[in-house]
Amino acid sequence: MLHKKYRPNVAAIIMSPDYPNTCEIFIAERIDIEGAWQFPQGGIDEGETPLEALHRELLEEIGTNEIEILAQYPRWIAYDFPSNMEHKFYSFDGQKQRYFLVRLKHANNIDLNKHTPEFRAYQFIHLKDLLKKIVPFKRQVYRQVIAYFRREGYLGC
């Protein structure tokens, strides 16, 4: 059996500023793949902690890192890239991620064009509608992480 190589990565489950009064989660549509909705995520640079990477990636991808950290998933969680997906990380079989549950402080600070755009659109959707919108190969990971945050009492909806 071949040893798989995963790219270290962080991902953010971003609750709306109205959480816990409303249970809406930020998702964004990739600029390079129409219809591919996901959480903001990105690689961890050499010498960077996952928390530092989270703040940098949010600033780069959504134009703000003004968040309140609610919880962190306690382990790395991996997924494989689909075999039919053309991805830019050819030396990796997939990504291993650290997930953070955060609450956005101000929705009006979102700016998808602040840096090199990675997303074409965003929306806040109810948690119950999340898995219908997300690309299929990430659904199992999202299910697992959300179940953990609910079970541990960090996500109350």
Swiss-Prot record:
It comes from the Bacteria. The keyword Methyltransferase does not apply. A motif (Nudix box) lies at residues 42-63. One of its GO terms (biological process) is mRNA catabolic process. Gene3D superfamilies: Nucleoside Triphosphate Pyrophosphohydrolase. Its EC number is 3.6.1.-. Residues 5-147 form the Nudix hydrolase domain. Its cofactor is a divalent metal cation. GO terms for cellular component: cytoplasm. Keywords: Hydrolase. It is an enzyme of class 3 (hydrolase). NCBIfam families: PRK00714.1-3, PRK00714.1-5. Belongs to the Nudix hydrolase family. RppH subfamily. HAMAP family: Nudix_RppH (MF_00298). This is RNA pyrophosphohydrolase. It comes from Helicobacter pylori (strain Shi470). The gene is rppH.
